[in-house]
From Swiss-Prot:
GO molecular function terms listed in the Swiss-Prot or TrEMBL record: acyl-phosphate glycerol-3-phosphate acyltransferase activity
Keyword set includes Protein biosynthesis: no
HAMAP family attached to this UniProt entry: PlsY
Pathway assignment: Lipid metabolism; phospholipid metabolism
Transmembrane segments: 8-28, 70-90, 111-131, 144-164, 165-185
Family: Belongs to the PlsY family.
PANTHER family on file: GLYCEROL-3-PHOSPHATE ACYLTRANSFERASE-RELATED, INNER MEMBRANE PROTEIN YGIH
Gene label: plsY
Assembly information from the UniProt record: Probably interacts with PlsX.
Protein name according to UniProt: Glycerol-3-phosphate acyltransferase
Originating organism: Streptococcus gordonii (strain Challis / ATCC 35105 / BCRC 15272 / CH1 / DL1 / V288)
GO cellular component: plasma membrane
Length: 214
């Protein structure tokens, strides 16, 4: 019981590490909340601090989710799904105690959670992400599409017997919850995509013809 409580606390604290915010403050003397979208996640870090900072931010945020799902293994915790620890880490990332409970959009950390629990399902989703990213040139659109596919797939694949061969109720519910968090956190992006003014990355074909505002 003590190990379980300790593990859940560690998962939240791990998720609460505001990677982009701290990198900006320590190495660039910039507060990401005052630049670009004001978000402290991977996309805004890339845009404001550059490729190296963005890559490091993504890697750490991603690993937060994966490591959280492995905490039961490290702490010898039985009887509780690793997905619970992953979910707690994502909640920590979204509402971090180290950053006034104002966190990122949960994409990288959620991806890390999925990898830690179901590498095959992760591989399927990452293919969708890359294809959508190339077509739209928008990380936000790719994240939104993947979240939608995750919800549909976790419900349908066990029925079809592919990738997810059987229903796992807890896994299904947590995937739906993580995807819902991502969709809710991207509401502003959805509005910009609708208005064709979303920020782009310099890769892909921008099929929706977005024109970001200067």
């Amino acid at each position: 019981m003590i190990n379980t409580i300790l593990g859940l606390i560690l998962a939240y604290l791990l998720g609460s590490i505001p990677t982009g915010l701290w990198i900006g403050q320590i190495f660039f003397k910039k507060n990401l909340r005052e630049y670009g979208s004001g978000n402290t996640g991977t996309t805004n870090t890339f845009r404001i601090l550059g490729k190296t900072a963005g890559t490091v931010t993504f890697a750490i945020d991603f690993l937060k989710g994966t490591l959280a799902t492995l905490l039961p293994l490290f702490l010898h915790i039985n009887g509780i799904s690793p997905m619970i620890f992953g979910l707690i880490a994502v909640l920590g990332h979204t509402f971090p105690i180290f950053a006034e409970f104002k966190g990122g959009k949960a994409v990288a950390t959620s991806a890390g959670v999925v990898l830690g629990f179901s590498p095959l399902f992760f591989s399927y989703l990452i293919i969708i992400f890359i294809v959508t990213l190339y077509l739209g040139s928008m990380i936000s659109l790719a994240s939104i599409v993947v979240a939608g596919f995750a919800i549909i797939s976790v419900l349908i694949f066990p029925l079809l017997g592919i990738i997810l061969p059987s229903y796992d109720l807890l896994f299904t519910l947590i995937i739906i919850l993580l995807a819902s968090i991502i969709l809710i956190r991207h509401r502003d992006n959805m509005e910009r995509i609708k208005n064709k003014s979303e920020n782009l990355i310099p890769w892909g074909i921008n099929i929706t013809k977005q024109v970001p505002k200067k």
